[in-house]
Amino acid sequence: MAQKENVYPWPYGSKTSQSGLNTLPQRVLRKEPAVTPAQALMNRSNSQSTAVPGQKLTENKGATALQGSQSRQPFTIDNFEIGRPLGKGKFGNVYLAREKKSRFIVALKILFKSQIEKEGVEHQLRREIEIQAHLKHPNILQLYNYFYDQQRIYLILEYAPRGELYKELQKSGTFDEQRTATIMEELSDALMYCHKKKVIHRDIKPENLLLGLQGELKIADFGWSVHAPSLRRKTMCGTLDYLPPEMIEGRMHNEMVDLWCIGVLCYELMVGNPPFESPSHSETYRRIVKVDLKFPSSMPLGAKDLISKLLKHNPSQRLPLEQVSAHPWVRANSRRVLPPSAL
């Protein structure tokens, strides 16, 4: 069935793809109100009442497509009570916030247009919004909606109460087999979902992984992601220690880059540092390209087997995600707990 065009406004005057936040499928859980606070956030129109410089006002066609609802007033910052800061970045800050009417707790990411324009990453931000808004999985941080004013862009995100995986790893140094295997199962399941939707994350690392109330993993930060039907890319991106050989060598790459990344992550969680970490960038590059992989004697054989099967120079030889979650070491050690929304 052909998808109806849904053009939603963008503060830089360019048209988005034929998709939008307002086309998100709605799920009604048993024993819950017909419209949950999260759904109300997604249903809300993000069309703006005043034109952004260089842009004509456009009708948000998707606003009336959901549940037969009428057009709603767009969000403004006045709709939220702002709490403590959750994080700071190059382009803005993230705050704990509460939508006043529903009392629903969210993470509000506030980005400064001037910084985004200065760095020329408008397209990257729009791509992040378009991709993340259409991903609904218990191990992917949900983007509920967005709005903007003259100076800022606001992303309304799911709140992950237990914060960054990176900070927990810093505190503990390493994770045990149970926790690492659980993360591997959660990641493989979430990435299988992404890949089926032709989305490659390309920047899986501890800093981009958050933790929900029950400690469940939440993939965040889709800024480097691509939604490419061809699944063939040739741009350099991601984090140095996590870059796969094909990207360093400038070769075409596909979704197999995410398999390499989770192999590197598994090693770092078990050992405390990435497998190819070196004093210089050039040495790190050299070790990655040669797959100069060295395991400490303390590494469990099952984890070693899994990592070795993921960190292959030839992308086609890497262990498929289906086999990651079914790997004997993962099956024996994973303690995955699905959040209520997934039951």
From Swiss-Prot:
Entry keyword Transferase: yes
UniProt-listed Enzyme Commission number(s): 2.7.11.1
GO molecular function terms listed in the Swiss-Prot or TrEMBL record: ATP binding; histone H3S28 kinase activity; kinase binding; protein kinase activity; protein serine kinase activity; protein serine/threonine kinase activity
Localization per Swiss-Prot or TrEMBL: Nucleus; Chromosome; Chromosome, Centromere; Chromosome, Centromere, Kinetochore
Main location: nucleus
Keyword RNA-binding: no
Pfam families: Pkinase (PF00069)
Organ and tissue specificity: High level expression seen in the testis. It is also expressed in the spleen, lung and heart. Expressed in the G2/M phase of the cell cycle.
Domain Protein kinase: 80-330
Top-level EC class: transferase
Modified residues (Phosphothreonine): 235
Listed SUPFAM superfamilies: Protein kinase-like (PK-like)
Catalytic residues as annotated in Swiss-Prot or TrEMBL: 203
Record's compositionally biased regions (Polar residues): 42-52
GO biological process, one term: mitotic cytokinesis checkpoint signaling
Gene Ontology annotations for the cellular component aspect, listed alphabetically: centrosome; chromocenter; chromosome; chromosome passenger complex; chromosome, centromeric region; condensed chromosome, centromeric region; cytoplasm; kinetochore
Stretches the record annotates as Disordered: 1-21, 36-57
Entry PTM: The phosphorylation of Thr-235 requires the binding to INCENP and occurs by means of an autophosphorylation mechanism. Thr-235 phosphorylation is indispensable for the AURKB kinase activity. Acetylated at Lys-218 by KAT5 at kinetochores, increasing AURKB activity and promoting accurate chromosome segregation in mitosis.
Activity control: Activity is greatly increased when AURKB is within the CPC complex. In particular, AURKB-phosphorylated INCENP acts as an activator of AURKB. Positive feedback between HASPIN and AURKB contributes to CPC localization.
Catalytic activity reported: L-seryl-[protein] + ATP = O-phospho-L-seryl-[protein] + ADP + H(+); L-threonyl-[protein] + ATP = O-phospho-L-threonyl-[protein] + ADP + H(+)
Annotated family: Belongs to the protein kinase superfamily. Ser/Thr protein kinase family. Aurora subfamily.
Subunit structure: Component of the chromosomal passenger complex (CPC) composed of at least BIRC5/survivin, CDCA8/borealin, INCENP, AURKB or AURKC; predominantly independent AURKB- and AURKC-containing complexes exist. Associates with RACGAP1 during M phase. Interacts with SPDYC; this interaction may be required for proper localization of active, Thr-235-phosphorylated AURKB form during prometaphase and metaphase. Interacts with p53/TP53. Interacts (via the middle kinase domain) with NOC2L (via the N- and C-terminus domains). Interacts with CDCA1. Interacts with EVI5. Interacts with JTB. Interacts with NDC80.
Function comment: Serine/threonine-protein kinase component of the chromosomal passenger complex (CPC), a complex that acts as a key regulator of mitosis. The CPC complex has essential functions at the centromere in ensuring correct chromosome alignment and segregation and is required for chromatin-induced microtubule stabilization and spindle assembly. Involved in the bipolar attachment of spindle microtubules to kinetochores and is a key regulator for the onset of cytokinesis during mitosis. Required for central/midzone spindle assembly and cleavage furrow formation.
Protein name: Aurora kinase B
Organism: Rattus norvegicus
Annotated gene: Aurkb
